[in-house]
Every structure is written in structure tokens, then in C-alpha cells.
Amino acid sequence: MNFQLQPTLTGKLVQLRPLQPADFDELFAAASDPLIWEQHPESTRYKKEVFQIYFDSAIESKGAFAVIDRKSGKIIGSSRYWNLKPLESEVEIGWTFLQRAYWGGEYNREMKQLMLDHAFTFVERVVFVVGENNLRSQKAMQKIGGRFWKKEPRPGPGSNQMNVFFVITR
């Protein structure tokens, strides 16, 4: 399988391109609103030192995207492919956020559809992992056709939070 984790994907509203180290300041500006993270398991990700960990992990993953509003040319969020499992014909899409001005409309739907269309040229199943208390993201998963799959404890020492898994199949 030759799954390209960071292609450039272009729709009417957004372009997804590989996230670069030089994107930190603009992406942090997009992420610095505490309300973006209020239901997220990492609720302090709006703080620069916490966001730096997220950003470094995104760069290291070699599957992260900068999400760009095609009208303004500005970075409005990020998402990534993660946890590619060729034997199971599966990949995860996650670590996604958008600025609040882009919530509730077509931006998330188009971003995810671009990623799904690309993924389904290589795999049969796409998995999304959402924090149990992140009801906003769970509703967004349902809007794009995600089906509840399972619930598991969130990994990490001392974590008592649960993750909810959604799946979309080709």
C-alpha cells in the first residue's frame, strides 16, 4: 500500500496542504481561542506551551495538514491522518480543529470529505476518535456519516476519560 499521508487536497472552500514548521504562529493564532477546546480532553490547548506539544506531534506524524480558507488564504485549522493499519485496511482521521467562525457550516464537511475521498482510494475503513465529553465533535461525526463503533479508555497514565470511536467504511 502506498498511502500518501500528506497530499495537497483542494475543494471549493478549503485547501489542505502538508503542515510545515513555519506554520506555527498562524496555526497557533487560529487555535488560541479557549472556546475551541472547552469540550476537548486537552482543554488547555489554547495555551502556547500546550499547543506547542500538539504542533510538534503534528509535524512528527508526517500526516498533518494546514487547513486553509481558500477565500482569505489564511490557516483556519488542522487535521491529520494517523495510525495507518495496512493489514486492517484502516486509517484514522483526527486531531482536527477549526476556528469557531468556521463551525457549523460546510467547512468541516468539505475538509473531511476531501480526506475521506483520498483515504478510500487506499483503505476500506476510516476511524475517528473523539473524547467522550466532546459532544460537539460527536455531533459533527454523525453529520458526516460516522457510525458509533466502540468506547475505550483514553490511553495515558491516570486517565479516567473515555474515547468514543466512530467509523466510516467505503
Name what the model sees in each region.
Residues 68, 94-105:
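A short, internal acetyl-CoA/4′-phosphopantetheine-binding micro-motif in the GNAT/acyltransferase core
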Residues 66, 74-83, 92:
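Conserved beta-strand in the GNAT
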Residues 104-118, 139, 143:
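Conserved acetyl-CoA-binding loop-helix of GNAT-fold acetyltransferases
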Residues 55-66:
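A short helix-loop-beta-strand connector motif used in the catalytic cores of GNAT acetyltransferases and
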Residues 121-130:
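Conserved GNAT acetyl-CoA-binding A-motif
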Residues 129, 147-163:
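Conserved catalytic-core motifs of GNAT/GCN5-like acyltransferases
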Residues 1-53:
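A short, well-structured alpha-helix characteristic of acyl/acetyltransferase catalytic modules
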Residues 133-150:
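Conserved active-site alpha-helix within GNAT-family acetyltransferase domains
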